[in-house]
From Swiss-Prot:
It holds the Pfam family tRNA_edit. It is an enzyme of class 6 (ligase). It is found in: Cytoplasm. One of its GO terms (molecular function) is aminoacyl-tRNA deacylase activity. It comes from the Bacteria. The gene is proS. Keywords: Aminoacyl-tRNA synthetase, ATP-binding, Cytoplasm, Ligase, Nucleotide-binding, Protein biosynthesis. Its EC number is 6.1.1.15. Homodimer. Belongs to the class-II aminoacyl-tRNA synthetase family. ProS type 1 subfamily. This is Proline--tRNA ligase. Consists of three domains: the N-terminal catalytic domain, the editing domain and the C-terminal anticodon-binding domain. The keyword Aminoacyl-tRNA synthetase applies.
Length: 571
């Protein structure tokens, strides 16, 4: 492709509304253009990268035995009402009516549509297991679209759905899809981690997220420094570093703390070590009007997912108001603790191993110092309540946890029978009786993958594409293309490279465009391999080659350039 036949629309300045690096660089490199909030046009340069990601996803889905379909983007309300999600789904679901006043929605996901397809097309156990997938545009009406393609309203997604007679069959497909996802992200050249995840509102019995590691990620993930263990913060089990509780060394004291309403104020005013403090959080219980106290160490954070999963705690988690706390305990939120607490209490594992610690006295403006379990108060129920922190022991017993930010680019679920039961999706089983199908679902944000790759691969000059995603493999940049010798050598090399199957962008802009601008544009776009043709180099029989990640160029003989490129370009 020649730039004279291509739309090269780079920008010198970064648009003011672009915050994350992928948004900035995709706009500057002319890959996307904003149409409205959360809506983007894919320009020719960006679309080439998107299609490459899509092709790899499609190849690996086909290898995994999935069957490609294409379902409507617009879905009838009746299907969502049948599953129960029409009422449950929030304003992210864009709803509309046609000219006949029939209700529809723009699909953010396709569980209902695929379940309807399965119940109409599948009738025998002999057709199972079966796995359908599509690569299609989705729409979610995000309240605050931001970060370009990272959290837009319209996006390209690969979603797959499998149907099974039993859990064993589902597990086999789930494992196959897990491996397919690992293959996809490895082929895309991404530094990623598959992590154990909470099933959330989708439900089911098993879930993994796939995260690209990047500082701009919205999620915290924990992984072992000595094994393959990885989980998101919501799911990771918190193992205390201590193995047993130290013996008491202080007397119990009640002190006045009128100006210490927070852990920070208690630490600053009384010289208490933060790891010797606890914080008491009060939430609604499952019984109406009941409150439950949850206690974690002062330097730890409550994990709301773990808390909501406790049998005596209401789900979703609801924190008690100050009025409710005062009515039940007789003190405000800044003065709560486990001693003489009149409501049920659950403490974190790390709290159970504390000695000589400080806590609120359940009296306004008073705290206890030197508290000890089984001396001053009995040990209450103990549970895993907190988020893990860096340095915690890995739950698999191998090494310590590292915490990094991640961008979620894929998610797989074992759905079970949530949709098939609600929508009566059955086939005739081997015993001649109707059997409700068990489902799995598997998603990849294809357009988000492109942005995530940039978040992980860039420098001060622009994008550093992994080879698999680069819109072009080679940038061919002639100096003084208008001169006969340079033009002939450039055109000959361009023909040879394209005949060899390489994707080449020949920068044939005229002399009004300086060499510096040409180099800057190619580095901004991130084309991995650059070949410069100049009259001075040709006089010596040489061409200049530079990989986008190299600091300095090198000279390669004209006669050797094809073999050299063959050795450097991964195809």
């Amino acid at each position: 492709m020649r730039t004279s036949q291509f739309l090269l629309s780079t920008l010198k300045e970064t648009p003011s509304d672009a915050v994350v690096i992928s948004h900035q660089l995709m706009l500057r490199a002319g890959m996307i253009r904003k149409l409205a909030s959360g809506l983007y046009t894919w320009m020719p340069m960006g679309l080439r990268a998107l299609r490459k990601a899509e092709a790899i996803v499609r190849e690996e889905m086909n290898k995994a035995g999935a069957l490609e379909v294409l379902m409507p983007a617009i879905q009838p309300a009746e299907l969502w009402q049948e599953s129960g999600r029409w009422e449950q789904y929030g304003p992210e679901l864009l709803r509309l009516k046609d000219r006949h006043d029939r209700e529809f929605c723009v699909g953010p996901t396709h569980e209902e549509v695929i379940t309807d397809l399965a119940r109409n097309e599948l009738n025998s156990y002999k057709q199972l297991p079966i796995n359908f997938y599509q690569i299609q545009t989705k729409f979610r009406d995000e309240i605050r679209p931001r970060f370009g393609l990272m959290r837009g309203r319209e996006f390209l997604m690969k979603d797959a759905y499998s149907f099974h007679l039993n859990q064993e069959s589902l597990q086999e497909t789930y494992d196959r899809m897990h491996q397919a996802y690992c293959n996809i992200f490895t082929r895309l050249g991404l530094n990623f981690r598959p992590v154990q995840a909470d099933t959330g509102s989708i439900g089911g019995t098993g879930s993994h997220e796939f995260h690209v590691l990047a500082e701009s990620g919205e999620d915290d993930i924990a992984f072992s420094d000595s094994s393959d263990y990885a989980a998101n913060i919501e799911k990771a089990e918190a193992i205390p570093r201590e193995t047993e509780r130290a013996a008491p060394g202080e007397e119990l004291r009640l002190i006045d703390t009128p100006d210490a309403k927070t852990i920070i104020e208690l630490v600053e005013q009384f010289g208490v070590a933060v790891e010797k403090t606890v914080k008491t959080l009060v939430v609604h219980g499952v019984e109406k009007g009941q409150l439950v106290a949850l206690i974690v160490r002062g330097d730890h954070e409550l994990n709301e997912i773990k808390a909501a999963n406790l049998a005596q705690v209401a789900s979703p988690l609801v924190f008690a108001s100050e009025a409710e706390i005062r009515a039940a305990i007789g003190a405000g939120p800044g003065s709560l603790g486990p001693l003489n607490l009149p409501i049920p209490c659950v403490i974190d594992r790390s709290v159970a191993l504390m000695s000589d610690f400080s806590a609120g006295a359940n009296i306004d403006d008073k705290h206890y110092l030197g508290l000890n379990w089984e001396r001053d108060l009995p040990l209450p129920q103990v549970a895993d309540l907190r988020n893990v922190v860096a340095g915690d022991p890995s739950p698999d017993g191998k090494g310590s946890l590292v915490i990094k930010r991640g961008i979620e680019v894929g998610h797989i679920f074992q759905l079970g029978t949530k949709y098939s039961e609600a929508m009566n999706c059955q086939v005739m089983g081997e015993n001649g009786k109707p059997a409700t199908l068990i489902m799995g679902c598997y998603g990849i944000g294809v357009s988000r993958v492109v942005a995530a790759a940039i978040e992980q691969n860039y420098d001060e000059r622009g994008i550093l594409w992994p080879d698999a995603l680069a819109p072009f493999q080679i940038a061919l940049v002639p100096m003084k293309y208008e001169t006969e010798a340079v033009r002939e050598a450039t055109d000959k090399l361009y023909a040879e490279l394209t005949a060899a199957g390489y994707e080449v962008l020949l920068d044939d802009r005229d002399k009004k465009t300086s060499p510096g601008v040409k180099f800057a544009d190619m580095e901004l776009i991130g084309i991995p391999h650059r070949i410069v043709v100049s009259d001075r180099g040709l006089a010596d029989g040489m061409l200049e080659y530079k990989h986008r990640r190299d600091a300095q160029p090198q000279q390669v003989a004209v006669s050797d350039i094809l073999s050299f490129i063959n050795s450097r370009v991964h195809r």
